[in-house]
A protein has these predicted regions:
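Conserved N-terminal beta1-alpha1 strand-loop-helix module at the mouth
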Residues: 1-222
Length: 222
């Protein structure tokens, strides 16, 4: 289970999320109570372990500017949280190692999410960062995509959300804060633990899928 702690504004909170077992740390560059400057984030990511996926979150920024910031300060991923077109998302993905495309729950574009050519698709509440929970039945995994579930998640409901939706990953902002822009260590720890536990329970309940043997020697070169 991929766990992303987003809305991080300080080195202290970034290192806290890492210590608690997060896979990814998100930094918001769009106007928000949690907005941080690229220069500040550049200093923070230098101090994080190399295995952590560092993500810049953008809303309606030009594709060129997204690539410039991500690559310029050493981030590993971009999260596009605006009205980007499939062509813009693909253009960014050709130049950035990992891209997440976010959609509001119920948005018609989700049906064509695969056209964006990104690494994962996020389904969020209609008001991102509001802490509002939406109807999880609206968060079906788009065909051929990895789903990251966001929107109103917190330590007490993330397990239920994972059990119902069965996403590839989860993302949290307000649900692990003591106040906007500041993470609460106990909440971060509890959130990561609950997400991991829910994923393990799903694996234990599900029967393994039988995979037919594959003869690599018979593979036809493309």
């Amino acid at each position: 289970m991929f766990v992303k702690i987003c809305g991080t504004t300080s080195e202290e909170d970034a290192l806290l999320a890492v210590a608690m077992g997060a896979d990814a740390i998100g930094f918001i560059f769009a106007p928000s109570p949690r907005q941080v400057s690229p220069a500040r984030v550049g200093d923070i990511v230098k101090r994080l372990p190399s295995e952590i996926l560092t993500v810049g979150v953008f809303r309606n920024e030009t594709a060129q500017r997204v690539v410039q910031i991500v690559n310029g300060i050493g981030l590993k991923a971009a999260q596009l949280h605006g009205q980007e077109s499939p062509a813009e998302a693909r253009w960014v993905r050709e130049r950035v190692p990992f891209v997440i495309q976010a959609f509001a729950a119920g948005h018609k574009a989700i049906r064509s999410a695969r056209d964006y050519g990104v690494d994962a698709v996020m389904i969020d509440a209609p008001s991102p960062g509001s802490g509002q929970v939406f109807d999880w039945s609206m968060a079906e995994t788009p065909d051929g995509c990895r789903l990251v579930l966001a929107g109103g998640l917190h330590p007490d409901n993330v397990g239920h959300a994972i059990a119902q939706v069965r996403p590839w990953g989860v993302d949290v902002v307000t649900g692990v804060e003591s106040e906007p822009g500041h993470k609460d260590a106990r909440k971060v720890r509890a959130f990561v633990a609950a997400a991991r536990e829910a994923a393990v329970l799903i694996e234990e309940r599900d029967e393994p899928v039988e995979v037919a043997p594959y003869d690599w020697d018979q593979e036809t070169p493309q």
